[in-house]
Structure formats: structure tokens, C-alpha cells
Amino acid sequence: MTSFLIASNILLWLAFLGVTVVMLGLMRQVGLLHERSSPMGAMITDHGPDIGDAAPEFELPDFFGRPVRIGGAEAQGRQTLLMFTAPSCPVCDKLFPIIKSIGRAEGINVVMISDGAPEEHRRFLDSHELGEMRYVVSAEAGMAFQVGKIPYGVLLDGQGIIRAKGLTNTREHLESLLEADRTGFASLQQYMASRKKQAA
């Protein structure tokens, strides 16, 4: 009986040591993955005007008939965030209050640009308070910027120059557009790549 207890105790300790080795290996792998994965900003997925180019210029009416100017110098020199969305896009719907709060907090103009049937836009606007934002229905603007996926953001400086752009599915993606402009890099990915080169 005693030899059975000794053998089971030895087996238990061997199993414990095995689990410990496996856990240490897993912790190391998680650490390596964490180190390799950098923050992801808004991904540039279009083939439209490049960062540093002048944005295409438009004079369009918003959904309510008021004139909206896209591109070119802004009268007060403020930045403009163009958000390409759709009333049927669930991610756009979720981002709407975030876009509104970032626009207000950063003091930038926000122009929501969409296309589709007027009834869809009316339903969307009936359930969302625009505040200072403008809402434009224009397939032409989306084609000029060659937007293929939504929600897509384009940040213009006060002179109408594209400073940052990319697919914006989260608050972090939206904030990365502003951060890319502040740091002078075209995208967060470009910024992280330059940091890796400096570290090497």
C-alpha cells in the first residue's frame, strides 16, 4: 500500500511539473505575440487620392438643401473629417455617436457622405441627431475618393489636403486618423514601421 502511495505521489509531481513547463511555454508565446502585434489604425484600402494630395473639390447640397463644400481651403482653417457611410451599415450606425463626439472634442468639421435611396436616409436621420455635422448624399464624392468599403474616413487639413485616411470600424481607427496627422505619418502602420527601424 505504501509503495502505491509513493508511486501515485511521484506521478502527481511529474504531472504538475509537466503542466508547469507547458504553462511557461504558453506564457512565452503570448508575450511574443503581444510584442509582435502593434496597434492597428485605420487601414488604407482605396486607390483614390493619396495622402498629401489635394482632395477632390465639390459644392453639393446636404440632405436638407444647405450648401456644403468638400475640399479646398476651409474658411476658418479647421480640419474636416469626411466619413463615407451608408444608412444600412450597422457599423456606421454604431460609430455615429463616436464620430459626433470626436468631431466636437477635436473642433473639426464632420461631413457624412452616403448614397442610396432618399427614404433610407430619411429613416436614418429621423433616428440620429446630426448636431453640427453635415449629411450629404453623393455617389459622385465616393467615386472621386474611390471608396470601396465603409465606414471610411478621410481627414483634410484646413487647406483641403488629405492628411490621413482609412477604413474606420472602431473608435481607435477614427482616433488613429487624427494621430497619424499629428505625428506626420500617413498611417499608424507607417509610424509603427518607422519605430521598428529606429529600434533595429
Swiss-Prot record:
Main localization of the protein described in the UniProt heading: membrane
Membrane-crossing residue ranges in chain numbering: 4-24
Origin: domain of life: Bacteria
Keyword Flavoprotein applies: no
One annotated GO molecular function: antioxidant activity
Disulfide bonds, paired cysteine numbers: none
InterPro entries linked to this entry: AhpC/TSA, MeN_DH_accessory, Thioredoxin-like_sf, Thioredoxin_domain, Thioredoxin_ResA/DsbE_sf
Subcellular location: Membrane
Keywords from the UniProt entry: Membrane, Transmembrane, Transmembrane helix
Associated pathway: One-carbon metabolism; methylamine degradation
Membrane topology, from the record: Single-pass membrane protein
GO cellular component terms, A-Z: membrane
Pfam family, one: AhpC-TSA
Entries under NCBIfam families matching the protein: MauD (TIGR02661)
UniProt-listed PANTHER family: THIOL:DISULFIDE INTERCHANGE PROTEIN DSBE (PTHR42852), THIOREDOXIN-LIKE PROTEIN HI_1115 (PTHR42852:SF17)
Functional note: May be specifically involved in the processing, transport, and/or maturation of the MADH beta-subunit.
Entry protein name: Methylamine utilization protein MauD
Organism in which the protein naturally occurs: Paracoccus denitrificans
Designated gene of the protein: mauD
